[in-house]
């Protein structure tokens, strides 16, 4: 890799780490999923946005909104951020607008984006049970398990080439891990 091609990765990493640390510092209960989780599992791919499942318990959702304010991230859609505090409004977004995520971003730095999952299948409660813990800059964050990521990628419609590629990569990693475990027991 040449020096110039690695520069965006540094920028990408720093804004993602900044967001993860802010969520942790605000004591937000969340699980990282999507492309960032893929990278954290060892899959080589590029991603700029951060996909998260956040517990939408009222106090936790308020801490999440406070973190978004401190990060200067605002809703991408022309609706108030506080909509995530109301479960009926979330249900209406999913039902009426077919919304899968609620996006917060910076209009000045559009690569600084976080997608909050809205659907039950990608909820915090669904992903947290077998999430693994990862230390980042003195904090511990939860990352969706490979199995959950495979399930999530398998449900995407329409099927996208990157999701098929991600499923293959995760399956290969799981196979290598099983093979290595088998060798260490022998």
Task: Name what the model sees in each region.
Residues 1-186:
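Compositionally biased terminal segments of proteins
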